[in-house]
Amino acid sequence: MLSMLESILLSVATSEAMLGILGNIFIVLVNCTNWVRNKKLSKINFILTGLAISRVFTIWIITLDAYTKVFFLTTLMPSNLHECISYIWVIINHLSVWFATSLSIFYFLKIANFSHYIFLWLKRRADKVFVFLIGYLIITWLASFPLAVTVIKNIKVHHNNTSWLIQLEKRELLINYVFANMGPISLFMVAVFTCFLLTISLWRHRRRMQSTGSKFRDLNTEVHVKAMKVLISFIILFILYFMGVLIETLCLFLTENILLFIFGFTLSSTYPCCHSFILILTSRELKQASMRALQRLKCCET
């Protein structure tokens, strides 16, 4: 039986998850509708659609995983179910981070303004960069999945073992956990680096505008700022997400601490929910579609 605080926290996390699913499904529906209407899908809309679909699956997986562990943790949890959920999460989580990183690289190549020949070469060959990212995704998948299998199997064994043995193996298991997530972590670091370069580009652009004596905020600055909001929010929310997943993993060693586990679930649910609404608010197309949807809902109520 859950305590009052645990029930409230679980309700908050579940509400976050449901809102995240609705927000991501909305992005998919808008982009797919435009795809059917225009008979083509732009690169940015493809990335946003793929990101939204992967996040819907991510939310379902972490929610299912949380509920099975909360209500089966003190009894007999089906180990095969836990193992299956963990494998699916490894694949979908990797794919979700890849789409988010691809989005950051797309913004960087489209918006940033550098005269360096490497940047100009990449800007002219954006399609090849995208193909390279697909190759990198496959390579990191192949490299990290065997380690993920080891971690999942070790957790399954240690969860059924004695407490002193768990304490003895904990450091090794956490090291393996970090290495198993090196693929998503490396992709995240690429997103951080592109955000840093985009910040430099914005700073240079503002200096250039000040040197020319312009006091008006131009379109290029607004585009830079919108992209920065998306990337910085992604970085902050993904750190919270990773912390939440790490807390949930650590709670496998602290089976009596349900509250801490639910807190980790709440943190991990924040990223796929909040960032999706930030994407909607910063995209003119998605924002207009959301305003039209809200107006229709108001008309239906009246």
UniProtKB/Swiss-Prot annotation:
- Origin: domain of life: Eukaryota
Spans traversing the lipid bilayer: 8-28, 44-64, 88-108, 129-149, 183-203, 234-254, 258-278
Show the GO cellular component annotation of the record: membrane
Q: Which residues lie on this side of the membrane: Cytoplasmic?
A: 29-43, 109-128, 204-233, 279-302
Single annotated GO MF: bitter taste receptor activity
- In which compartments does the protein localize? Membrane
Record's keyword annotation contains Mitochondrion:
no
Membrane topology per record: Multi-pass membrane protein
Q: Does the keyword Electron transport apply?
A: no
Carbohydrate attachment sites?
A: 160-161
Query: Which family is it part of?
Result: Belongs to the G-protein coupled receptor T2R family.
Q: What does this protein do?
A: Putative taste receptor which may play a role in the perception of bitterness.
Record's protein name: Taste receptor type 2 member 104
